[in-house]
């Protein structure tokens, strides 16, 4: 984990040195994809199965809070111009020293500082009980065939497959919703872009509430009881598309976020538990990350296609609701839930 935070820091420094932003972000993304299995795998190894839902609830709360805090901090840094002539000085200094003139050097410095502190904190984590069974992280150990077999193995497991299916579907829909909410805030509510971002923050607040409730109300053996939350989320999407009043949009967005948080946390815990039993704690999270990111890419590509075709927002929201409804109904049927 410390090494991956150091790699993220390297990506930021590369951007400062004039490396193309796409390549720099690819380095940061590579580090993030390796960091997540270590983080969630550590949780799986650190707490007993009966506490896994609660641990995931607190982890989800902390992640969303960090996103909100980071977004707010970024806005403050971008809006802070410092003393008179500060921006021009930064641009001149960074051009001479780094070869890339920028007025945002103080923003990059804060990001580097945060990644550096995170790497130092991660370095203090003590090895868990599964340390002896871990494969060293090196390119020679990377095997697509082995990874694909692990992927199929997790999908074929009755409990692991359902939880992986639900989280994959959730993240694909959620990725589109991030952009759809901004567009809806502008077209339906008449808000500017910066105010539309507040609507996104309301969803995040709802996720925090839902994650905390899930950690308090559910245990691993009752994780299947949260599946109908997916149907509630599907019902809310087309309703939001027709809302034109901010006072009504606020509770709807928070309710949608809460439904998503309550659905995601127990499913994550169930997937981690089954994945650790079938594969290993870290490997199962890597499989989960692969499927979820593939879902995000696919859904965003489809969303871009609908925008290119000029499909109205209400129709896009309705299609999202239908995808979620048709996707969740097979696993939400009473007979199916009893079989889990």
Predicted region positions:
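Helix-to-loop junctions at the C-terminal end of transmembrane segments
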Residues: 1, 78, 209-223, 307
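Substrate-agnostic recognition of the 12-TM MFS/MFS-like secondary transporter fold
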Residues: 1-7, 23-79, 170-178, 203, ...
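Structural signature of the two symmetry-related core transmembrane helices
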Residues: 1-13, 224-240, 318-321
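Transmembrane alpha-helix termini and helix-breaking/packing motifs in multi-pass membrane transporters
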Residues: 13-17, 69-111, 187-188, 297-317
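Helix-loop junctions on the cytosolic side of multi-pass membrane transporters
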Residues: 41, 45, 101-104, 108-138, ...
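C-terminal transmembrane helical hairpin of 12-TM major facilitator-type secondary transporters
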Residues: 224-264
């Amino acid at each position: 984990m410390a090494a991956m935070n150091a790699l993220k820091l390297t990506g930021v420094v590369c951007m400062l040195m004039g490396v193309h932003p796409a390549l720099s972000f690819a380095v940061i993304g590579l580090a993030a994809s390796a960091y997540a299995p270590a983080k969630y795998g550590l949780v799986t190894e650190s707490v007993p199965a009966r506490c896994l839902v609660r641990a995931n609830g607190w982890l989800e709360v902390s992640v969303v809070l960090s996103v909100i805090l980071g977004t707010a901090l970024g806005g403050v840094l971008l809006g802070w111009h410092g003393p008179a002539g500060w921006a021009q000085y930064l641009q001149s200094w960074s051009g001479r020293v780094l070869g890339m003139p920028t007025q945002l050097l103080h923003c990059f410095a804060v990001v580097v500082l945060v990644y550096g502190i995170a790497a130092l904190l991660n370095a203090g984590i003590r090895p868990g009980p599964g340390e002896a069974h871990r494969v060293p992280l090196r390119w020679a150990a990377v095997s697509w065939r082995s990874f694909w077999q692990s992927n199929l193995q997790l999908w074929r497991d009755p409990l692991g497959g359902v939880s992986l299916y639900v989280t994959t579907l959730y993240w694909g829909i959620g990725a589109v919703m991030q952009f759809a909410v901004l567009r809806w805030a502008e077209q339906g509510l008449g808000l500017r872009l910066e105010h539309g971002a507040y609507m996104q923050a309301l969803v995040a607040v709802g996720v925090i509430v839902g994650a905390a409730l899930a950690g308090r109300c559910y245990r691993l053996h009752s994780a299947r009881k949260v599946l109908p939350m997916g149907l509630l989320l599907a019902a809310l999407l087309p309703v939001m598309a027709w809302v034109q009043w901010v006072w009504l949009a606020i509770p709807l967005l928070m309710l949608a976020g809460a439904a998503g948080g309550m659905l995601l946390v127990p499913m994550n815990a169930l997937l981690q538990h089954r994945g650790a039993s079938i594969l290993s704690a870290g490997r199962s999270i890597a499989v989960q990350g692969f499927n979820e990111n593939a879902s995000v890419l696919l859904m965003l590509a489809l969303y871009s296609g609908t925008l290119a075709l000029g499909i109205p927002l209400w129709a896009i929201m309705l299609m999202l609701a239908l995808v979620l409804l048709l996707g969740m109904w097979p696993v939400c049927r009473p007979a199916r839930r009893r079989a889990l």
